[in-house]
Amino acid sequence: MNKNIKTTALSAAITMALGLSLNATAGGKGVSEVLDAVKNKANDVVESVVNSSLNDFASQFGEGNTEISIRKVKGDEADYSIITTQPLTSLGEDRARLFWQGSLGSYDQSGDRRTTLNLGLGNRWLIDDEKAIVGINSFYDYEFSSKHKRTSIGGEYKRSNVELNVNRYWAISDKHSVDGTDEEALDGYDAIFKGQLPYLPWANLVAKKYKWDRTNQDDVDGSYYGIEAYLTPETKLEVGKQDDNYMIRETYAKLTHSFGANSDHASLTDSAIATVAYQDGENMKNKMLNKVERSNKVVVEFGGITMSRTD
């Protein structure tokens, strides 16, 4: 906690203590009012300190967007990640912007905790009078302890009420032994769709289709679907079901907190029900540095038998 935060908290505490001592003799009613005021002041101080700390942390990454998330599938250990998307150029006259994206994740790989680095470059263009974004990107993925490597290319289309991302992945590391077990990163693809629910600008339907190529057994063919709800402009919760031909359908949940210049999404803190069905036609300029939607976890086959689950 920096010096300014400490000073603010100490000042607030002293002010509240003086308020109590001056008003305690005013009788039961006065004490009750003071206690309510103290509670409200304490809430304001805590909120201010937390927001200040998060903003200080986010400012270390630049003007783009940064988010932290935790994802849990029933029966598996949780996955954790931090992702930042930052500009390499300003918005040009051709309405294009070059950016980079980096992420670091801690993932459960069949009971083994592993860290993965993802680095990517992308270019996006504003089209349709700045009401839509189209983009292309390329990524490199590296799982540290196993040395699995993978590349990908992707394309995206975004509007204020709908978006579609399609990604193709290629393993560039060979099958090799990790702690006595033969492992192999897999090729594959995914397609991710998000669409606003009618009259609920703070909620999206999320659907993902994925397929991973296996050599000696049936390919992994699966999907997940759920609801993504913005609890605040910065915090969203996604809950749904994931299923493929190698797993039983299970419930998953993902909690994400974003911070940066563009954390301004409609949320439950606004009106719960909108007067129009879809929030279409909004300017997308401030969404040019939103993260690329993709699978950051390297999908691995273990001993030619078991599989890790996609994120």
Which stretches of residues belong to each language-model region?
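Outer membrane beta-barrel translocator domains of Type V secretion systems
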Residues: 37-126, 131-143
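Flexible, glycine-rich linker and terminal segments associated
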Residues: 27-53, 58, 172-206, 212-217, ...
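Gram-negative bacterial Sec-dependent N-terminal signal peptides
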Residues: 1-25
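Transmembrane beta-strand segments that form the barrel wall of outer-membrane beta-barrel proteins
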Residues: 64-72, 95-108, 132-143, 153, ...
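Solvent-exposed loop/turn segments connecting transmembrane beta-strands
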Residues: 71-80, 105-117, 142-149, 183, ...
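Intrinsically disordered low-complexity regions specifically enriched for long asparagine
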Residues: 19-31, 81-84, 260
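Intrinsic low-complexity, intrinsically disordered segments enriched in polar/basic residues
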Residues: 2-6, 50, 212, 224
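Feature captures outer-membrane beta-barrel proteins of Gram-negative bacteria and organelles
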Residues: 56, 78-93, 115-129, 151-168, ...
